[in-house]
Amino acid sequence: MQVLLVEDDQTLFQELKKELEHWDFFVTGIDDFSAVMDIYEETNPEIVIMDVQLPKYDGFYWCRKIRQVSNVPILFLSSRDNPMDQVMSMELGADDYMQKPFHTNVLIAKLQAIYRRVYEFGAEEKRTLNWQDALVDLSKDSIQKGDSVIYLSKTEMIILEMLIQKQNQIVTRDTLITALWDDEAFVSDNTLTVNVNRLRKKLSDIGMDTQIETKVGKGYMAHE
């Protein structure tokens, strides 16, 4: 697995690089933190590990840049004890977030889970779902309604797929969290809310934001 590790703390970078390579990850680092996108495009990584606090521009800036061209999984690292950093990372389309210090075994487990979810899922035959008058392409993470197309993150698509498969039924928040993350203890309840709100915002671009209903205290429901 090719990993781009965007971390300016060289001691931590070397520790993580050594551990990741022990697990057969191929790790590329950054020398020039004003050229993160150049390195990203050269290496075409399968997963990006991104520190929040970086020289030149912060990790959120680079996440925005990457999301303009790719849905590659992004996992944020941060030493700041600020819940809004986690909220911001989810709003920008990151796949996971870890606060320093952390155990490397947990990082490895998260990376392996992300890889299975994104690439083994993506390797399946093309699958589509018809939802109302829209075509949901699970292999491309896209929704087409008429001539309009929107693209979702992997997390948003997993949420939408679960809701569509149980149309007019309530899917509980716990069910969604369990499906999205292997260990729900590492996920705040607010993280799911952020992802659903971001999904609704994208659906609003094709006039479908009202088709996902919040059931207060329970979960969410997609209408037929």
From Swiss-Prot:
Q: Where is the Response regulatory domain?
A: 2-115
Residues of the signal sequence? none
Keyword S-adenosyl-L-methionine applies: no
Which GO terms of type biological process are on file?
A: regulation of DNA-templated transcription; response to antibiotic
Localized where? Answer: Cytoplasm
Query: Which Pfam family, giving just one, matches this sequence?
Result: Response_reg
Concerning Gene3D superfamilies, the annotation shows: 3.40.50.2300, Winged helix-like DNA-binding domain superfamily/Winged helix DNA-binding domain
What positions are modified (4-aspartylphosphate)?
51
Looking up InterPro entries in the UniProt record yields: CheY-like_superfamily, OmpR/PhoB-type_DNA-bd, Sig_transdc_resp-reg_C-effctor, Sig_transdc_resp-reg_receiver, WalR-like, WH-like_DNA-bd_sf
Q: Which GO terms describe its molecular function?
A: phosphorelay response regulator activity; transcription cis-regulatory region binding
List the stretches of this chain annotated as a DNA-binding region.
126-224
Question: What keywords tag this UniProt record?
Answer: Activator, Antibiotic resistance, Cytoplasm, DNA-binding, Phosphoprotein, Repressor, Transcription, Transcription regulation, Two-component regulatory system, Virulence
GO cellular component terms attached to this protein's record: cytosol; protein-DNA complex
Q: What does the record give as the function of this protein? A: Member of the two-component regulatory system GraR/GraS involved in resistance against cationic antimicrobial peptides (CAMPs).
Query: What is the protein's given name?
Result: Response regulator protein GraR
This protein's species is Staphylococcus haemolyticus (strain JCSC1435)
GN (gene name): graR
